[in-house]
Amino acid sequence: MTMEVSKKKGGDFQQCHELIPGLPSELALECLVRVPFQFQSAMRSVCRSWRSLLSDSSFIQERRRCGKTELLLCLVQPLTPPIPASKSVDETLMVDEKKSEDESHPRVFCTPRFGLSVYNAAMSTWHRVAFPEEEQIPLFCECVVLQDAGKILLIGGWDPETLQPTRDVYVLEFAGRKWRRGAPMKESRSFFACASVSPTKVYVAGGHDDQKNALRSAEVYDVEKDEWSSVTPMTEGRDECQGFAVGMGLRFCVLSGYGTESQGRFRSDGEIYDPATDSWSRIDNVWRFPDTSPRGRTAGDFRSSSTLWCFTDTDLQSERRWETNDDSRNLKLDLQSIQLPMTGSSVFAGSLGGESVVMIGGKRESEGEGEGGVMMKMTTEKKMGKWSHHVHIPCDFSTLPFSHASIYV
């Protein structure tokens, strides 16, 4: 038994009441770890011992041991539907030019609010995570998971009131179901690369500042110390780049992006950071779609392989597969372009527990009936992608996500 129910870390759970009256603690624990995740909020209100048990990080380890963990896909997405066609852009954004002396930026009203949506793959259910009433989720923030720590982080993005890049960090403790403020980044940034590269570290790089300048800078967040540290900057400024962990999850890859003077023309190369040497290596010929951002169009399981799936609207007969190495020759990426199986009003690709999934939006409300969308999983057979497992997305959750992460609970 990997978890003691009679003794909690810190010594404040030395003697607990019976978890289930009349049952030995070990047997009671075997029952409680089998309760589906969706009912665990209600379990917390039953008694203090249950609340303490569910708040302990080792509870998820017991669920994992019993094979009862559930996979959640977490999505940062707008809460409001797309702008109606009859309404002009000028009507949707209203800027208050009457600034007080201590305001460095005007406040912007009527911008869409963002939320954190969750799809439970085991139960095929959708719900939205409550956020503190006095706060708002930053627009276009990055969502990243630290699985072993049981935490979801929302990093950077735009301030909802000023639409300026922010340094803010919000941490959701899944065990206690509580939000807290994390230490802010050293530099404000949005549309940057972000990934967890070890059980306790999150790296960010690139993006742009409040003047739309592409950034070279990079930082690392230590979740245990709740602090940020600067690392060696990249050789190129990269706005709208994509980040992921490679090399068995030990290095940080920043894919494509564009410079300040070439906005909208996405680079074909990338850079890979090695924490062991605090240095970057370059990887060429990795992104062959200069008119398309890699954000929301790539997926892969880089913890155990080096394959990157690139999802496209058309079938690229001559460029279906290619491979490339970084200039240190320490890492090889195998890339494959996959044509999307259907079209829709929006497309977002990502990873769900190491498998590739694509969310395709349906009709907009202004086009008539709201159809929601569909999510499809791609399985790999003989190194070829095959679509399966169609999941209907309710209308309330079918807006285009900006970032995502998946976590076992």
From Swiss-Prot:
Per-repeat ranges for Kelch: 98-148, 151-199, 201-248, 251-300
The protein, known as: F-box/kelch-repeat protein At2g44130
Keyword terms of this UniProt record: Kelch repeat, Repeat
The keyword Endoplasmic reticulum appears for this protein: no
One cellular-component annotation, GO: cytosol
Domain F-box: 17-63
InterPro entries: F-box-like_dom_sf (IPR036047), F-box_dom (IPR001810), Kelch-typ_b-propeller (IPR015915), Kelch_1 (IPR006652), KMD1-4 (IPR044595)
GO biological process, one term: regulation of phenylpropanoid metabolic process
